Amino acid sequence: MSDNLALHGTTILCLKKNEEIIIAADGQVSHGNTILKSTARKLRTIANNKIIAGFAGSTADGLALFEKLEVKIEQHKHNLLRSAVELAKDWRSDKYLRRLEAMMIVADRNHILILTGNGDVVEPENNVAAIGSGGLFALSAARALMSYENNLTAEEIALKSMNIAADLCVFSNHNIIMEKVV
């Protein structure tokens, strides 16, 4: 696929405030300068909502990674950190997986992790992580709101941050889906 027709962007945001963990995603799928779908679901729950994952990048690649992550989570008895590290190792070393163009945020009660195709497993500072074309907008908004708006819940911060990202990123929209880690 040529660069000008590549599948573009999304915004995935995950944050933890007062022991509440929320992952939010917009619903837009773009191809070049065309919106293909505005109601895509980019979040998946695993292990009876105890683990939630969101992806940015190629839809098919993101879904393939979800499947691989689910297998790892079952193999490692719902240990998210170990499962993420094992997936990242496979992603980096496997010829097929190495070609996948996606990033993931995964979270459980104890961890928020960013997984990349380079084999990175990053636990972000400040209990906030974001990926995708609108990720930096959402991350900045969430960090500011968490610092200065103590009366807002995690869900309210996520929604406000995602809406700011959608206002600024042409590859993200206001069709926000949120999931809560239980």
Swiss-Prot record:
InterPro entries per the UniProt record, alphabetical: ATP-dep_Prtase_HsIV_su, Ntn_hydrolases_N, Proteasome_sua/b, Proteasome_suB-type
PROSITE patterns to which the protein is assigned, alphabetical: PROTEASOME_BETA_2
Description of how activity is regulated: Allosterically activated by HslU binding.
Enzyme Commission designation: 3.4.25.2
Any Pfam family hit: Proteasome
Binding site for Na(+): 166, 169, 172
Gene Ontology BP, a term: proteolysis involved in protein catabolic process
Cellular location(s): Cytoplasm
GO cellular component: HslUV protease complex; proteasome core complex
Lineage top rank: taxon: Bacteria
Cross-referenced CDD domains: protease_HslV
Family affiliation: Belongs to the peptidase T1B family. HslV subfamily.
NCBIfam families: ATP_dep_HslV (TIGR03692), PRK05456.1 (NF003964)
Function noted in UniProt: Protease subunit of a proteasome-like degradation complex believed to be a general protein degrading machinery.
Complex formation: A double ring-shaped homohexamer of HslV is capped on each side by a ring-shaped HslU homohexamer. The assembly of the HslU/HslV complex is dependent on binding of ATP.
This protein's name: ATP-dependent protease subunit HslV
